Amino acid sequence: MFYGRYISKLILCLCLSSMLQSCVAIASLGVGVIGVSAIQRPQIQDNINDNKIYSLINLALVKRFNKLYKKLYIQVLYGRVLLIGNIASQEDMLDILDIVWGIDGVVEVINELNIKENSNYFDSKQYFKDTYITLSIRSKLVNASHIQSLMYNVTVIDNVVYLFGIARNLEELEEVSSIAANAKGITDVKNHILMKDDLNK
């Protein structure tokens, strides 16, 4: 099985996680209730604004959704908010979207939330598999000389890869996308990478 073959590799990858944390800044509140992250960028003021946005989102969602099985990944880039995770109902999804849109500074909400009946169930095997895929992609981004890895977030849930960040040019975008698409064990890639030139328009 996948897990038997890769568990030793996963352990090795986890040993590298402290190094790879420089790629993505992730903070959690509670026991995995909500994960939030902001992509690191050289523009200090933009980072401050994004940090404020995801902090406000985090606080609002913790206040509204106090059940510990809720697990969302919220990423913010230039006011664009990417929501990733499994939730229990359409009602919860609408509440989450309403809360996020109500935060000052949010200019776009990218909804990658999935309704999953057993979203409160923690599947340890799937978690280890997703973690292995995530770390393997991140390590390749770090080692790719033509990729500015600090500009990308990689999130994997249920074998689906979610990419978020800023590509300096088309070649870098294609290389990042290719690394994710060729990762072993994935079923899909959701690409939400911005082109640097588009930000200047």
Map each language-model feature to its residues.
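N-terminal targeting leaders
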Residues: 2-8, 14, 20-201
